[in-house]
């Protein structure tokens, strides 16, 4: 029974890390598309848009990093 609970912990951590990575990839794709759309509509705002794009992209990219940290915690500290 204990092996089953360990396996479920490992699978839960893998699903958590995988879904966070997929969600961030979709979010960055949408964000990049909106950045290009905004840059095409108003080329004079490209420096402002670029700054905001990289700030938000960093925040979106932090989510999978946090999920990896939590997943490793679940796999090695909780187990």
UniProtKB/Swiss-Prot annotation:
The keyword rRNA processing does not apply. The keyword Membrane applies. It comes from the Bacteria. Keywords: ATP synthesis, Cell inner membrane, Cell membrane, CF(0), Hydrogen ion transport, Ion transport, Lipid-binding, Membrane, Transmembrane, Transmembrane helix, Transport. Pfam families: ATP-synt_C. Its main location: membrane. The chain crosses the membrane at residues 11-31, 53-73. It is found in: Cell inner membrane. The record marks 61 as: Reversibly protonated during proton transport. It is a multi-pass membrane protein. F-type ATPases have 2 components, F(1) - the catalytic core - and F(0) - the membrane proton channel. F(1) has five subunits: alpha(3), beta(3), gamma(1), delta(1), epsilon(1). F(0) has three main subunits: a(1), b(2) and c(10-14). The alpha and beta chains form an alternating ring which encloses part of the gamma chain. F(1) is attached to F(0) by a central stalk formed by the gamma and epsilon chains, while a peripheral stalk is formed by the delta and b chains. Belongs to the ATPase C chain family. F(1)F(0) ATP synthase produces ATP from ADP in the presence of a proton or sodium gradient. F-type ATPases consist of two structural domains, F(1) containing the extramembraneous catalytic core and F(0) containing the membrane proton channel, linked together by a central stalk and a peripheral stalk. During catalysis, ATP synthesis in the catalytic domain of F(1) is coupled via a rotary mechanism of the central stalk subunits to proton translocation. Key component of the F(0) channel; it plays a direct role in translocation across the membrane. A homomeric c-ring of between 10-14 subunits forms the central stalk rotor element with the F(1) delta and epsilon subunits. This is ATP synthase subunit c. It comes from Serratia proteamaculans (strain 568). The gene is atpE.
């Amino acid at each position: 029974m204990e092996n089953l609970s360990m396996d479920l912990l490992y699978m839960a951590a893998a699903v958590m890390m995988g879904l966070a990575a997929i969600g961030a990839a979709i979010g960055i794709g949408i964000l990049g598309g909106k950045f290009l759309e905004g840059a095409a509509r108003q080329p004079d705002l490209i420096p402002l848009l670029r700054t905001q794009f990289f700030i938000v992209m960093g925040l979106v990219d932090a989510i999978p990093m946090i999920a990896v940290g939590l997943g490793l915690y679940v796999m090695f500290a909780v187990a």
